[in-house]
Amino acid sequence: MNLYFWILRLAAWFGHRKAKKLVAGQAMAIAAMQEWRATTMGAPVLWIHAASVGEFEQARPIIERLHQELPFRKILLTFFSPSGYELRKDYPLVDKVAYLPFATKRNAKRLLEILPIQTAVMVKYEFWPAYLKALEDKGVATYLISAIFRPGQLFFLPWGKGYLKLLHTFKRIFVQDQASAQLLMKHGVSQVEVAGDTRFDHVVEVRKQAKDLPIVEGFVAGAERVIVAGST
């Protein structure tokens, strides 16, 4: 894991634009947490971590519900990717948006010393060993949402037993499909529940609030079929 972070730093040194943003943002992450801590008045922190934009959309329905039902908690939203951070750094339903400090044992320990994190939510594929172990040591209830597991993943290979143990650090794992749940239970991970892809919850809410768009209605008028393509 440390090798991966050194490669990122090397890429930043050679001028890779995204790597430079990532390294610069993560270098300031701990200081940003300390500064924010002074404004939280000791309120418990609910930490949600998403890798990038897509994972944020999976966390979004949960954030909206938590913001509504638990207003006394401070919500921290972290990103690994610069694209996620840049797009959502002013997201109004959380109290703080920050980069995830590089996942080293030292940073994980410092983050949990700085912030009174009461609950942590990781999205889909976020399995940072240093953070998961630190959260477990602190007794923080940690959840994984919108996860998908497949037989070829490291957890289920003969040399991946250490990573399989990481899954036991989660209090509950919410997966997208029955196949993922069965695979986990086959390997002794029983705290699992099929909950689907949380992005659909947001899509349903958007559909309920949809407004008529005359330009679109005019475009599709009389058509038997309409094909909509995105990110092509």
Per-segment meaning from a language model:
Residues 1-10:
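N-terminal, charge-rich interaction modules
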Residues 204-223, 232:
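ALDH superfamily catalytic-core signature
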